[in-house]
C-alpha cells in the first residue's frame, strides 16, 4: 500500500474558503477540494483552476479541484467549513444564526456520509453556535469537531500590541478566550512580548484600548470593507489549525472546544487554550483565572448560550 497525500475539503468558495484553499495548498498540507452549491460550481472550478495554475510558479505540489458534488470529498482527512451567509454592516451575529445553522446541518450530513473518520474545523459565524450545531449533527467525537476564533482574535491582539510597542509580531504572545464576539476575553496576565509581561511594558489605559479594539476587530473590518468581512487573517488562522492537525504538531492554540466541566461549563462550545494535534483537540488546558477573568468568561459563555437559545 503506497503512501497517499492527505485530502482537505474546504466547504464554501467565497473569499475565506478560496483563500484558505490556496494557503493550505501552498503549504503542501494535502490535495484540496473546494466545494460550493451547484449555482456556484463554475466559479468554484474557475477559482480552483486559477490556484492550480499558480502551483508551477510558486513551486507547490498539491492538486486543487472545484466541485459542487460532495462525492468528490470522499475520504477527506480534514474538512474546513466556511460556508454560510456573511454578516453585513449593522447586522448582529445573531441574525445569522438560523440561516447558517440550517446550512451547517445540510453540509455536515454530506461530509460525514463521505468522510466518516474526518476531523471538522468550523469558521462560519456565529462560530461557537455553528460548531455546536455541526458537532450535534455529525455524531463525531467532540475532539474532532473544532471551531476557529481564538487564533484570529489572538492574532488581532498581537498585531495591535506589536504596533503599540513597535516590535516584531513574532515576539508577542497572548491568549484570547471565550466566545467570538464582543464579550471575548483577552488574558493580559498570560500575554508577553519577548517573555516580558505586557503589563510591565504598556500602561493600563493603552492595554484597555487594545483589548477593546481586539473585541471589535471583526466589526472594524466589516465597516471598512463596506461589503463582506475579513478573510485573509481568518484563512491564515484556519491554515495554522490544519497544519497542527495534519502534521500532528501538538500546538498550544486557543480553539473552540466542547466543554464538559472544564472551566465549570457543561455542553457548550467555547474558546479555550487547547493542544491541537493529529487527534484534533488532544487536551484542554485549564488556566487559573482571577475572579474578574472568570466573571468575564462567564459573561462570554452566557452570550454563547443566548445564541444557542436562538436556534430553532
Curated annotation (Swiss-Prot):
Q: Which family does it belong to?
A: Belongs to the LDH/MDH superfamily. MDH type 3 family.
The question of whether Plastid is a record keyword is answered with no
NCBIfam families per the record? MalateDH_bact, PRK06223.1
The record's catalysed reaction(s) read:
(S)-malate + NAD(+) = oxaloacetate + NADH + H(+)
Q: Which organism is it from?
A: Oceanobacillus iheyensis (strain DSM 14371 / CIP 107618 / JCM 11309 / KCTC 3954 / HTE831)
Name the enzyme group at the top EC level: oxidoreductase
What does this protein's UniProt record list under function? Catalyzes the reversible oxidation of malate to oxaloacetate.
Q: Catalytic positions? A: 180 (proton acceptor)
Q: Enumerate the InterPro entries for this protein.
A: L-lactate/malate_DH (IPR001557), Lactate/malate_DH_C (IPR022383), Lactate/malate_DH_N (IPR001236), Lactate_DH/Glyco_Ohase_4_C (IPR015955), Malate_DH_type3 (IPR011275), NAD(P)-bd_dom_sf (IPR036291)
Q: Which GO terms describe its biological process?
A: lactate metabolic process; tricarboxylic acid cycle
Q: State the Gene Ontology terms under molecular function.
A: L-lactate dehydrogenase activity; L-malate dehydrogenase (NAD+) activity
Q: What is this protein called?
A: Malate dehydrogenase
**Which keywords has UniProt assigned to this entry?**
NAD, Oxidoreductase, Phosphoprotein, Tricarboxylic acid cycle
Record PTM Phosphoserine, positions in chain: 149
Where on this chain does NAD(+) bind? Answer: 12-17, 36, 100, 123-125
Membrane-crossing segments per the record: none
- Any idea of its EC number? 1.1.1.37
| Lineage, uppermost ranks | Bacteria, Bacillati, Bacillota, Bacilli, Bacillales
Amino acid at each position: 500500500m503506497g503512501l497517499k497525500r492527505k485530502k482537505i475539503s474546504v466547504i464554501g468558495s467565497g473569499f475565506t474558503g478560496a483563500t484558505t484553499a490556496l494557503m493550505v495548498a501552498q503549504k503542501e498540507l494535502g490535495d484540496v477540494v473546494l466545494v460550493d452549491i451547484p449555482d456556484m460550481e463554475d466559479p468554484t472550478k474557475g477559482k480552483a483552476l486559477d490556484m492550480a495554475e499558480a502551483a508551477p510558479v510558486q513551486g507547490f505540489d498539491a492538486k486543487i479541484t472545484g466541485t459542487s458534488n460532495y462525492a468528490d470529498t470522499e475520504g477527506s482527512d480534514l474538512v474546513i467549513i466556511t460556508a454560510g451567509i456573511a454578516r453585513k454592516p449593522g447586522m448582529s451575529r445573531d441574525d445569522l444564526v438560523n440561516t447558517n445553522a440550517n446550512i451547517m446541518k445540510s453540509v455536515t450530513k454530506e461530509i460525514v456520509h463521505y468522510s466518516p473518520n474526518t476531523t471538522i474545523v468550523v469558521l462560519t459565524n456565529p462560530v461557537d453556535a455553528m460548531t455546536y450545531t455541526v458537532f450535534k449533527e455529525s455524531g463525531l467525537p467532540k475532539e474532532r469537531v473544532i471551531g476557529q476564533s481564538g487564533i484570529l482574535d489572538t492574532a488581532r491582539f498581537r498585531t495591535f500590541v506589536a504596533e503599540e510597542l513597535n516590535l516584531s509580531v513574532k515576539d508577542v504572545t497572548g491568549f484570547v478566550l471565550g466566545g467570538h464576539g464582543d464579550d471575548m476575553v483577552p488574558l493580559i496576565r498570560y500575554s508577553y512580548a519577548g517573555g516580558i509581561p505586557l503589563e510591565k511594558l504598556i500602561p493600563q489605559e493603552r492595554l484597555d484600548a487594545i483589548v477593546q479594539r481586539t473585541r471589535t476587530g471583526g466589526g472594524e473590518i466589516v465597516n471598512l470593507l463596506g461589503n463582506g468581512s475579513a478573510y485573509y487573517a481568518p484563512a491564515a488562522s484556519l491554515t495554522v489549525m490544519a497544519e497542527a492537525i495534519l502534521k500532528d504538531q501538538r500546538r498550544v492554540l486557543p480553539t473552540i472546544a466542547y466543554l464538559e466541566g472544564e472551566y465549570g461549563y457543561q455542553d457548550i462550545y467555547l474558546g479555550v487554550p487547547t493542544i491541537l494535534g493529529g487527534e484534533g483537540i488532544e487536551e484542554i488546558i485549564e488556566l487559573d483565572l482571577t475572579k474578574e477573568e472568570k466573571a468575564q468568561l462567564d459573561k462570554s459563555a452566557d452570550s454563547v448560550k443566548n445564541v444557542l437559545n436562538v436556534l430553532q
